Amino acid sequence: VYERAKESGVNVACGVDKLKRGFFDCPVYSSFDEVKEYADGVIDFSSPTALDELLRFCVSNSMPLVLATTGFSEEDDEKISEAAKLIPIFKCSNTSKSVYLFLKILGEVAEKLSDYDAEIIERHHNLKKDAPSGTALSAYNAIEKARSDKGVISEAVFGRKGLSKRKKGDVGIHSVRGGSLVGEHEATFYSQYDSISITHTAYSKVLFADGAIDAFRFIIAKEKGLYSMDDLMRTNV
């Protein structure tokens, strides 16, 4: 994000990293409590464990926030919604525009093929901590919503094991971790006679950095509230 921000004309005032990894020509602090600089907003790719400190900093300084971290609990989501009553927050599980379109296509296919069996497989590098990925959960949500509109009840099944028959409406979600794979998400719809697969593969994290910078430019001009990729894509950024 730092390199792409500089290349796109966005000045990075400082960074926050408890381990202070990497080399930058701006200050890097181990805590938000140490930050002295003023900025137009914050871009966050970190961990759910940093949420409380992050929200406290942004709210107390009236700073817009791009929240691109995944793995939040329901309690975390409630905290984010409460903070969004005070500041503008852009929250998404994936900042890539192509992933956004991937999810939209999934919803359309799920609606048209509501009687097909659906399975989701996500693959990431061996250092990714949360499973399933936020994007895989977004894929399930897209399928579930599209099918509920047709009166079909869906249920997520995380990693199949044991002896059990697949139930109608089940959506399997499977996670693979290995090597340095940036990220791949595949959704397949099966019938007795055919199948259709929709896949998104990320080859570089530049994809997500550019999307986060677009989200930053978008959110700093907004009033308080909770925003998503739907809002950003409507602006044709």
Descriptions of predicted regions:
Residues A5, V35, L54-C58:
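Generic structural signal for hydrophobic
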Residues A83-C92, S191-I198:
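Glycine/charged-rich beta-loop-alpha catalytic/anionic-binding loops adjacent to active sites
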Residues S46:
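Conserved NAD(P)H cofactor-binding loop of Rossmann-fold oxidoreductase domains
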Residues V42-I43:
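N-terminal Rossmann-like NAD(P) cofactor-binding module of classical short-chain dehydrogenase/reductase
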Residues T49-R56, S60-N61, A68-F90, K97-Y100, ...:
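Rossmann-fold NAD(P)-binding glycine/threonine-rich loop
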Residues K91-V99, H125-P132:
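Short, surface-exposed loop/turn motifs that are enriched in glycine and acidic residues
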